[in-house]
From Swiss-Prot:
Subunit-level organization: Heterotetramer of two alpha chains and two beta chains.
Keyword vocabulary terms for this entry: Acetylation, Heme, Iron, Metal-binding, Oxygen transport, Phosphoprotein, Transport
Phosphotyrosine PTM positions: 24
Gene: HBA
Free-text tissue specificity from the UniProt record: Red blood cells.
Protein name as it appears in the record: Hemoglobin subunit alpha
Protein family per UniProt: Belongs to the globin family.
Length: 141
């Protein structure tokens, strides 16, 4: 459960990402594919080479979904319901992949926004991404 401080940290930090959300989302995806090659199995139709337009486009989709979630921290289940259905029933993504992508996103964000990525912000973002992962895997049961 996100505390009021967590919510403030997440909203404030996410606001500092600005127009880079898509760029950072794509970088996090590419980082995940390189670090955890088994995650590539869900993207057989993608060009997975460095700088791929498909990775960038999907990274933007991921980042846009997270931006929506940041705007609706009080109702993550409602905000992410369609994505949860899609990943559980149609795409059948292994739930562990959400944790892997969350980790790669934290690494990416910390590398770009070092000054703002304090231990407190790190903890809040980790809790936020964990909450998102929990919602996205809720329809698997």
């Amino acid at each position: 459960v996100l505390s009021d401080e967590d919510k403030t940290n997440v909203k404030t930090f996410w606001g500092k990402i600005g127009t880079h959300t898509g760029e950072y989302g794509g970088e996090a995806l590419e980082r995940m594919f390189l670090s955890f090659p088994t995650t590539k199995t869900y993207f057989p139709h993608f060009d997975l080479s460095h700088g791929s337009g498909q990775i960038k486009a999907h990274g933007k989709k991921v980042a846009d979904a997270l931006t929506r979630a940041v705007g609706h921290l009080e109702d993550l289940p409602g905000t992410l319901s369609e994505l949860s259905d899609l990943h559980a029933h149609r795409l059948r993504v292994d739930p562990v992949n959400f944790k892997l992508l969350s980790h790669c996103l934290l690494v990416t964000l910390s590398s770009h926004l070092r000054e703002d990525f304090t231990p407190s912000v790190h903890a809040s973002l980790d809790k936020f991404l964990s909450s998102v992962s929990t919602v996205l895997t809720s329809k698997y049961r």
